Amino acid sequence: MPDKAASSAYLGLLRLLLYGGAYREMPSPPRLSKDAIIGFGNSGQLEMLQVLMDEVVREGVTGDFVEAGTFKGGVAMYMAGFLSVNDRSRKVWALDSFSGMPTPDKITAKTGRFPAGSLATPGGLASVQNDFARLGLDRYATLVPGWFNETLPTMPERGLKRIAILRVDSDIYSSIMETLQALYPKLSAGGYVVFDDYKFPFARKAVHDFRRRHGITSRMRWCNASSEPPMHKCPGVHDEFLYWKKAPRARSNRASTG
């Protein structure tokens, strides 16, 4: 059994490191460039993601943790850190082009957000690999570089069988749909799918289109300042995320997929 106190202390320090919190809490914090911060958002998101990770490990939900859209790798590193002290039988899969966004689909392009090449990972794949290694977390994660339409179909042959946590940070409509179509069937009952971009209209459309097409009725829940405890530590619209728990498949020819 892992030492809970030691695990909690380690993960708390890891959150501070990934989001620059150790510097922000200084009496006179240094000015950090955005490239010096590995994570996006704030550590409250990681605390709330940990609630879901704790549950799937405690309940024995089968599968690895997957992040589709990893950017600089902050969240994936936290998931790997969590597994390093809680369940080393699992691993993290982190997918990204590491070279920026693809040409946006028509639905996303109408909004003017995320043009081709935006959100390129500073330093590219090598930088993320180096950060995983510096933190001693590279053994718990596999980075999968490339466009989703090329890499997602290869995940079974790479060794991904089942998923317990699926974090979708794919940004644009087409990439979110590609992620869900390829990976949601691998999400185990009792596992969670988490969306970082639901605040954008094209992301909401992708989520609702996918749920409708597949008859998914699982209750959608928010992590933000107005959420039920303990999911209330993600303050502000830019830090919230949406998630739901996949239900077991109903015994019916017209069953939902959860």
Regions found by a protein language model. Give the residues of each.
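S-adenosylmethionine/decaboxylated-SAM
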Residues: 14-43, 59-258
